[in-house]
Structures are given as C-alpha cells and as structure tokens.
Amino acid sequence: MTPPHNYLAVIKVVGIGGGGVNAVNRMIEQGLKGVEFMAINTDAQALLMSDADVKLDVGRDSTRGLGAGADPEVGRKAAEDAKDEIEELLRGADMVFVTAGEGGGTGTGGAPVIASIARKLGALTVGVVTRPFSFEGKRRSNQAENGIAALRESCDTLIVIPNDRLLQMGDTAVSLMDAFRSADEVLLNGVQGITDLITTPGLINVDFADVKGIMSGAGTALMGIGSARGDGRSLKAAEIAINSPLLEASMEGAQGVLMSIAGGSDLGLFEINEAASLVQDAAHPDANIIFGTVIDDSLGDEVRVTVIAAGFEANGPGRTPVMGSTGGAHRIESAKAGALTSTLFEPVDAASAPLHTNGAALSIGGDDDDVDVPPFMRR
C-alpha cells in the first residue's frame, strides 16, 4: 500500500524593483519561514545586493542593467520581455505575493505583469505595494495611482501602504527610525500573518483552502494585526486588529473574515472565545468567518491576532471604530515595545485602491528605481 503524500502549499514572495527587492531582503533578514523568495529588477547592480535565492535581471536589452529611469513603461516592457522566464519561476506556486514600491519604473510597470502571470498559472495572488509621499511630486503620485489600478486588476487581493500616513503617526518626538521600523513591522507581519496560518500547525487549523476562500477575488480587503500581553490580552489584541490605531478604520460590513490567534501553549479557550466573538460582532452578520490558532511558545506571554476582512460593499470598509476603541489615540512607540503593540492596514475609497496599510517610500532626487526603495528598508 502506498503511503499518503504530505502536500504543502507552495508560497512565493516576489519583490520587483528597488522597493520590492528591499522588502524581500527585510523579510529574509527577519527569518520569514515557509516561503520561497524571488528578486526581480532592471538594476543589475542593486540585484547583486539581494539575499533572495532566486534573482532575475529583466530588461537586459532595453535597459542594459541600468534601471528603468523611473519610467513605468520601461518597467512593464522589461517584465513583458521576460515573461517566459518569470512564468517558469512562478510555476507550481499555490500562492504568490508581489511586492513593489509604486511611483517609479520597474516596480510600477512590472508588478502587474508578474501578478497577471501568477494568476494565469492559478496561484492565489496578493499584491503588497507602497504609495509615495505627496511631497515626492504629482508625476510620481499619478504614476503610482495608475500602477495601483493596473495591479488591482491583476491581483486577487491588493494591499497598498500609504506613505503619507507616516507623517500622521504619533507625536512629533517619534524618531524617524522608530516610525520606519513600525511600518516595517506592518509589512512583515502582514505577510507573515497569512503564511503562518498556512504553514504552522495549530490547535484549530486554517489550511490553504480556507485562506483562498477568503482572499480569492477579494478586491477590497482590510488586514489588521494586533498584539498584547497581560490581563485581557486576547481581547485587547483583537480590538487593535479590527480597529486602525491611526485611521479609525473598521471592518464593519465584511462578508469574509480570516482570523488567526497566535500564542503560547497557555493560550486559553475562554480568551480565544472572547477575541473571536469581538471579530464576529464587527463583521457582517452573515459573514463567512474562518478562524484558526497558532501555538508559538516563542511569543511568551504575548498573544497576536491577525484579521483579514474582505468582501466589502462598493463603498469599501467603514471607518467607525468597534466597541469605542481609542483607535486614533495609539501612537508609535519605540521598537522596544511595551505590553501593548499594534499595527493595521488602512482601507481607502474603492475608486482609488483596494486595501491599505502604513508604510513608506522616501528618497527623492534619484532618477531611477532606487526611488522605489522604502526608507525603512534601506540600510
């Protein structure tokens, strides 16, 4: 008798352009497990610095490895010309994350091409990109919006990180490094929150089919991550996850919700029930709620709640906090976080972009894809 095979979901994270490649480097540095990393760029020199196992320099003929010159059309053509190579690299993936910095050349133009290929191959495709600061100029902003719109059409779910929100986070005494580090954690934990659900066994398992059921063709989505320690930790973490500390956005009206509670082996049934009930109350009454736990003793006393809410009406996620949350009052703390920490992806109007978080892409003055590189990813 042939023994049963153990099939694991194949998850690939693709960084394209300066910002995307640096995002991938950061995830590798932080030890994100259970995924395959790919780095794609028109800048051959920058690509040499990548820690990804798979590297692909695109546009060799058109850019001679010197970058896209902040021209999305050059980035798009470079990716199109390498379509066969990209398809071969993505083949076999069950889920593909595409990350980039919007507004420049390679990431803006190439990300939709990669997402289209991944989706055509049947992979659940999630985009994670940054929107530039307003002070980076109207041209860059317009290019970013066009790139986001194109990527939205190519992805199942799109997460957009609005850099302007960094200017509104916390008091003016918060250091630049702490602000960027906080945004960095949102990006990393967002991807990790999804992948851990699939790759890490829990007492209540969420498998890839559950994740796909919520995120496939989701369009507008809201992703929240909250963590807390001490008394009422699970409830606090859940409240943070479903209320944006920065934007007072809520998941009210979501038709599909994916929820994960991660904690040590002392995670109690009562506190799990409290957290799950809060999320259930915040969603649409008829929402499809998929719930799972991850036991991770390295968290110690900390409980981490990840919520992905999707299937909103045309007007997008609501902005009313749940249970009188002090949403807008939370400030960015130093990286040496205290007992309570929080991060959340921000929703926007459906007309502009589907799903949002707090993130960054600074550096002005360069004329190439380096402008795509989020400052918190720079070393």
From Swiss-Prot:
InterPro entries found in the cross-reference section: Cell_div_FtsZ (IPR000158), Cell_div_FtsZ_CS (IPR020805), FtsZ/CetZ (IPR045061), FtsZ_C (IPR024757), Tub_FtsZ_C (IPR008280), Tubulin/FtsZ-like_C (IPR037103), Tubulin/FtsZ_2-layer-sand-dom (IPR018316), Tubulin/FtsZ_GTPase_sf (IPR036525)
GO MF, one example: GTP binding
Transmembrane listed as a keyword: no
The keyword Cytoplasm is assigned to this record: yes
GO biological process entries: division septum assembly; FtsZ-dependent cytokinesis; protein polymerization
HAMAP family for this protein: FtsZ
NCBIfam families: ftsZ
Function comment: Essential cell division protein that forms a contractile ring structure (Z ring) at the future cell division site. The regulation of the ring assembly controls the timing and the location of cell division. One of the functions of the FtsZ ring is to recruit other cell division proteins to the septum to produce a new cell wall between the dividing cells. Binds GTP and shows GTPase activity.
Name listed for the protein in its UniProt record: Cell division protein FtsZ
Species this protein is from: Mycobacterium leprae (strain TN)
Lineage: Bacteria, Bacillati, Actinomycetota, Actinomycetes, Mycobacteriales
Gene name in the database record: ftsZ
